[in-house]
């Protein structure tokens, strides 16, 4: 009984194990056959799959969601392999997809199904590749647009700088012309004032010279302040004698005192003087007395 009770504390294969250890001294008794080693990460992954916590469809779900950071790498354009479980596209598939993208960057459902059947891929893979390709195309397009706009901006900036310098030059020329016009107008005003003053001085000098050089008139004193009668043309051509000059002065004083017919008498007097200067003066006074009494 005691032996049986003592043997109950040991497993049933205890004796067999000891004999097995004697036959195989290199192997130590452990739980290695039952539990795998957890020293490496891939062993942890295997252990998790062994425990049933990772489903076999999890890799396909990761490929189809496309929300992870390595989604673009999973469906990148190159044909290199980064991992055994990542589905990569070969060069022929990439070329075919590039040609279809050049035809149209929008992917229709029918076109997606045709490409998936032709390339042997899932429709979700085709859609993700087109999304990534459109993103890269938009980025390149933005870079091209930025370069074009930057060149245009540089050109416009250079033209603006040239226009600013030209505008400053024109403003400087305008200011110079304004200053020149002001100085010229001032000089012209001074010249006109000087010429006007010179003309007034010259005219006043001329008047003074005329007044100073004019001979005094004796006729006004003889006629009692009245202006002398106008001279006729006959006097210049037929100058009178001294005797006729005295008679003309007396007759002039006589006719100036008369009221009516003074101008007619003066004309007749001048005509008679002209003829008397040429002929004898014997018949002048009787005719004049007869004219007065008439």
UniProtKB/Swiss-Prot annotation:
Q: Where is the composition biased (Low complexity)?
A: 197-210
Membrane spanning residue stretches? none
* Alphabetized GO MF terms: DNA-binding transcription factor activity; DNA-binding transcription factor activity, RNA polymerase II-specific; sequence-specific DNA binding; transcription cis-regulatory region binding
Q: Cross-referenced InterPro entries, in alphabetical order?
A: HD (IPR001356), HDZip_class_I_plant (IPR045224), Homeobox_CS (IPR017970), Homeodomain-like_sf (IPR009057), HTH_motif (IPR000047), Leu_zip_homeo (IPR003106)
From the UniProt entry, list the residue stretches annotated as the region Leucine-zipper: 142-177
GO biological process terms, semicolon-separated: cotyledon morphogenesis; leaf morphogenesis; primary root development; response to sucrose
GO CC field: nucleus
Q: Does this UniProt record's set of keywords contain Transcription regulation? A: yes
SUPFAM superfamilies attached to this UniProt entry: Homeodomain-like
Presence of keyword Transcription regulation: yes
The record's DNA-binding region positions are: 82-141
Summarize tissue expression. Answer: Predominantly expressed in leaves and flowers.
Per UniProt, subcellular location reads as: Nucleus
Q: Quick one: where's region Disordered?
A: 181-246
Q: Which Pfam families match?
A: HALZ (PF02183), Homeodomain (PF00046)
Q: Which intervals carry biased composition (Polar residues)? A: 214-223
List the keywords (alphabetical): DNA-binding, Homeobox, Nucleus, Transcription, Transcription regulation
Q: Which family does it belong to?
A: Belongs to the HD-ZIP homeobox family. Class I subfamily.
| Function of the molecule | Probable transcription factor that may act in the sucrose-signaling pathway.
- UniProt name for this protein: Homeobox-leucine zipper protein ATHB-13
Tell me what organism the protein belongs to.
Arabidopsis thaliana
Q: What is the lineage of its organism?
A: Eukaryota, Viridiplantae, Streptophyta, Embryophyta, Tracheophyta
UniProt gene name: ATHB-13
């Amino acid at each position: 009984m005691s032996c049986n009770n003592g043997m109950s504390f040991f497993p049933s294969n205890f004796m067999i194990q000891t004999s097995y250890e004697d036959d195989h001294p290199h192997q130590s008794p452990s739980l290695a056959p039952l539990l795998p080693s957890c020293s490496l990460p891939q062993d942890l992954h295997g252990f998790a799959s062994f425990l049933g916590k990772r489903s076999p469809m999890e890799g396909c779900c990761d490929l189809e969601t496309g929300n992870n950071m390595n989604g673009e790498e999973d469906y990148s354009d190159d044909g290199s392999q980064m991992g055994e479980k990542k589905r990569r596209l070969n060069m022929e598939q990439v070329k075919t997809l590039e040609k279809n993208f050049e035809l149209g960057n929008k992917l229709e459902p029918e076109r997606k199904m045709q490409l998936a059947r032709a390339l042997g891929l899932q429709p979700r893979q085709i859609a993700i590749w087109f999304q990534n390709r459109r993103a890269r195309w938009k980025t390149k397009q933005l870079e091209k647009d930025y370069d074009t706009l930057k060149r245009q901006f540089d050109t416009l900036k250079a033209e603006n700088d040239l226009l600013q310098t030209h505008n400053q030059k024109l403003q400087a020329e305008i200011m110079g012309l304004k200053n020149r016009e002001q100085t010229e107008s001032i000089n012209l005003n001074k010249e006109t004032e000087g010429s006007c003053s010179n003309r007034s001085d010259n005219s006043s000098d001329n008047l003074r010279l005329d007044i100073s050089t004019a001979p005094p008139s004796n006729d006004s004193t003889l006629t009692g302040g009245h202006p002398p009668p106008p001279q006729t043309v006959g006097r210049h051509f037929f100058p009178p004698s001294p005797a006729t000059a005295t008679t003309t002065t007396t007759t002039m004083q006589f006719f100036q005192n008369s009221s009516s017919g003074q101008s007619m008498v003066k004309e007749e007097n001048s005509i008679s003087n002209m003829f008397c200067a040429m002929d004898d003066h014997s018949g002048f006074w009787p005719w004049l007395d007869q004219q007065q009494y008439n």
